[in-house]
Amino acid sequence: MALFLSHKEPLYRWGVWKMDESVDTLLDLLPEREYYEREVQRFVASHRRLEWLSVRALLFRLLGEHKEVCYQPSGKPYLADYSYFISISHTKGYVSVILSDKVPVGIDIEQYGQRVHRVAHKYMREDESVRLYKEDAT
């Protein structure tokens, strides 16, 4: 099981999943295997299948139950039963999910590199950015 990192707070919970399993292994981690086998066939590209299943495996790991993820026309995800606010992100080899039953949430992960530094001002406060650069220097 490739749960890389998870965290739970009173208002939200989130996790990051390293995508290193096969489609078949991911299907074994999920309840209602037939449902997921059928749904994953919509994707032609193998990396999209792994990404889609990894998000569902992480969601199941965070909640302990099957939840259907739907998408608004804008692409924003939501749960079919509206039990939680949800946000999903992915980058090379990883997916992340954040959930809250109380407040809207958002999450974004990026592969670490120079691009992160170029756009850091868009998503980090100044004190966070200073800390990031100090950590890079050590």
PLM segments and residue spans:
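Core catalytic alpha/beta fold that binds nucleotide/phospho-ligands
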Residues: 1-138
